[in-house]
C-alpha cells in the first residue's frame, strides 16, 4: 500500500513535518511512504532575496511529483504553508494540472489529508486546510484529519499547532521556530491514521 506525501516548503518547516508524517505512515504494517515535492514557481533571484535558497537545499533531493503519481497512490497526504489563509501558489498550480485525474476518477474513494504551517498562532491554518479539502472533495477523495484521539491535540501548556482538520506547525514571525515535539507527534499520528484508513479502504 503506497501513501504519497506531496508537499511544498519554502524554508523547511513543511518538509520537516512531511518527514514526520512519513514516519507515521511507515509505522503501519505494509504501508510505504513516498515523499514528493511540487515544482517551485519562483525564480532563483526571488528565492535568494527571500533567504530561501539555502533552506531549500535540505530537500532538493526529493523528486518532483508528477500528476500520474497521485493516481497510482492508495492515499495522498498534502502539505503546504499558509498564504493569506490559503494554500501556497505552488501547490495551487500543481493541483490545477490534475484535471485528467478528475475526468478519469482516479482519486475517487482514496484517502486524502492535509497538514500546514503558518508564521503566527492564528495565521490561517484551519482555513488553509479546509479550503484545501474542497479540492479533495471534487476529486472524490475520503477526507481524513487529525482526530482528538491524538492527546497532544488538547494540550494547554504550550503554544502549538494542530486541529481536528490536520497537523500544523507555527514558524514564528521570523521563521526561526522549528516544529515542536508535539507538532511532530501530531504529524506522525496523522500519517499513521491516514495509512490505517487507507488500508481499510483498499481491502477487497
UniProtKB/Swiss-Prot annotation:
Gene Ontology cellular component list: membrane
Residues annotated as binding substrate: 102
Binding, FMN: 9-14, 82-84, 138
Signal peptide: none
Amino acids binding NAD(+): 11
EC id: 1.6.5.2
Cofactor(s) named in the record: FMN
Catalytic activity: a quinone + NADH + H(+) = a quinol + NAD(+); a quinone + NADPH + H(+) = a quinol + NADP(+)
Keyword annotations from UniProtKB, A to Z: Flavoprotein, FMN, NAD, NADP, Nucleotide-binding, Oxidoreductase
PROSITE patterns in the cross-refs: FLAVODOXIN_LIKE (PS50902)
Cofactor, how bound (note): Binds 1 FMN per monomer.
Disulphide bridges: none
GO MF entry, a single one: NAD binding
Flavodoxin-like domain segment(s): 3-194
Enzyme class, spelled out: oxidoreductase
InterPro entries: Flavodoxin/NO_synth (IPR008254), Flavoprotein-like_sf (IPR029039), Flavoprotein_WrbA-like (IPR010089), FMN_Rdtase-like_dom (IPR005025), NQO (IPR037513)
PANTHER family in alphabetical order: FLAVODOXIN-RELATED PROTEIN WRBA-RELATED (PTHR30546), FLAVOPROTEIN-LIKE PROTEIN YCP4-RELATED (PTHR30546:SF23)
Family membership: Belongs to the WrbA family.
Name the record gives this protein: NAD(P)H dehydrogenase (quinone)
Amino acid at each position: 500500500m503506497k501513501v504519497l506525501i506531496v508537499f511544498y516548503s519554502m524554508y523547511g518547516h513543511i518538509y520537516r513535518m512531511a518527514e514526520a508524517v512519513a514516519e507515521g505512515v511507515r509505522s503501519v504494517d505494509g504501508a510505504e511512504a513516498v515523499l514528493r515535492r511540487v515544482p517551485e514557481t519562483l525564480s532563483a533571484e526571488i528565492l535568494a532575496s527571500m533567504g530561501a535558497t539555502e533552506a531549500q537545499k535540505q530537500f532538493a533531493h526529493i523528486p518532483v511529483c508528477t500528476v500520474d503519481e497521485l493516481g497510482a497512490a492508495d492515499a495522498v497526504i498534502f502539505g503546504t504553508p499558509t498564504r493569506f489563509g490559503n494554500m501556497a501558489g505552488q501547490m495551487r498550480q500543481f493541483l490545477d494540472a490534475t484535471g485528467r485525474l478528475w475526468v478519469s476518477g482516479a482519486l475517487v474513494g482514496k484517502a486524502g489529508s492535509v497538514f500546514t504551517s503558518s508564521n503566527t498562532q492564528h495565521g490561517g491554518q484551519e482555513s488553509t486546510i479546509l479550503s484545501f479539502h474542497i479540492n479533495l472533495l471534487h476529486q472524490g477523495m475520503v477526507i481524513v484529519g487529525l482526530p482528538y484521539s491524538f492527546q497532544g491535540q488538547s494540550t494547554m501548556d504550550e503554544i502549538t499547532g494542530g486541529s481536528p482538520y490536520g497537523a500544523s506547525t507555527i514558524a514564528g514571525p521570523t521563521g526561526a521556530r522549528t516544529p515542536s515535539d508535539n507538532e511532530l507527534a501530531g504529524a506522525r499520528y496523522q500519517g499513521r491514521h491516514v495509512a490505517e484508513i487507507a488500508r481499510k479502504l483498499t481491502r477487497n
